[in-house]
C-alpha cells in the first residue's frame, strides 16, 4: 500500500468548516455569527482565563504560600552518622559497601557526608565526599583514615 492509495473511511469526513462573512444568503454573512457590537464581536475579543472584568482576580487576592523557590540550588547529601556506621561491622566504608548493607539506595547519586563524634573501638577507613571536623578527629583517634572523593 502506498500513500496515494489511502482513502478515508466512509462517513468519517462529514464535518465541513464554516465559510464566514460571505453575504446574507450563506446564513453567516456580515457579523459572521458574532452578533452585534461588544467585546466578543471584536477580533481579539475574548478575555484571558481568570479575568474578572477589572476586579482584582482571585489568584491575586489570595496570598502566596509555600517555599517552592527557596533553596533549589542547595546541595543535598547522604548523611552518615558515626554511631550508626560503628554498628555495621565493616572495616572499609564506601558507596559500594553501604549499598551492599542497604544503608543507602543503589539509585542514589548524592555525595556522602560523614558526621558525628562517637568514640570508635576499631579503626575504620572511609571514602566519602565530605567530613565534619569532629568526625575526622574521632576516626583519626581510632587510627582510621578518611579519603575525600570529588563530587
UniProtKB/Swiss-Prot annotation:
<dbReference type="Pfam" id="PF00828">
    <property type="entry name" value="Ribosomal_L27A"/>
</dbReference>
<comment type="function">
    <text>Binds to the 23S rRNA.</text>
</comment>
<dbReference type="InterPro" id="IPR005749">
    <property type="entry name" value="Ribosomal_uL15_bac-type"/>
</dbReference>
<keyword id="KW-0687">Ribonucleoprotein</keyword>
<keyword id="KW-0694">RNA-binding</keyword>
<comment type="similarity">
    <text>Belongs to the universal ribosomal protein uL15 family.</text>
</comment>
<comment type="subunit">
    <text>Part of the 50S ribosomal subunit.</text>
</comment>
<dbReference type="GO" id="GO:0022625">
    <property type="term" value="C:cytosolic large ribosomal subunit"/>
</dbReference>
<dbReference type="InterPro" id="IPR036227">
    <property type="entry name" value="Ribosomal_uL15/eL18_sf"/>
</dbReference>
<dbReference type="GO" id="GO:0019843">
    <property type="term" value="F:rRNA binding"/>
</dbReference>
<dbReference type="InterPro" id="IPR021131">
    <property type="entry name" value="Ribosomal_uL15/eL18"/>
</dbReference>
<dbReference type="GO" id="GO:0006412">
    <property type="term" value="P:translation"/>
</dbReference>
<keyword id="KW-0699">rRNA-binding</keyword>
<keyword id="KW-0689">Ribosomal protein</keyword>
<protein>
    <recommendedName>
        <fullName>Large ribosomal subunit protein uL15</fullName>
    </recommendedName>
</protein>
<feature type="region of interest" description="Disordered">
    <location>
        <begin position="1"/>
        <end position="58"/>
    </location>
</feature>
<feature type="compositionally biased region" description="Gly residues">
    <location>
        <begin position="22"/>
        <end position="36"/>
    </location>
</feature>
<feature type="compositionally biased region" description="Basic residues">
    <location>
        <begin position="10"/>
        <end position="21"/>
    </location>
</feature>
<dbReference type="InterPro" id="IPR030878">
    <property type="entry name" value="Ribosomal_uL15"/>
</dbReference>
<dbReference type="GO" id="GO:0003735">
    <property type="term" value="F:structural constituent of ribosome"/>
</dbReference>
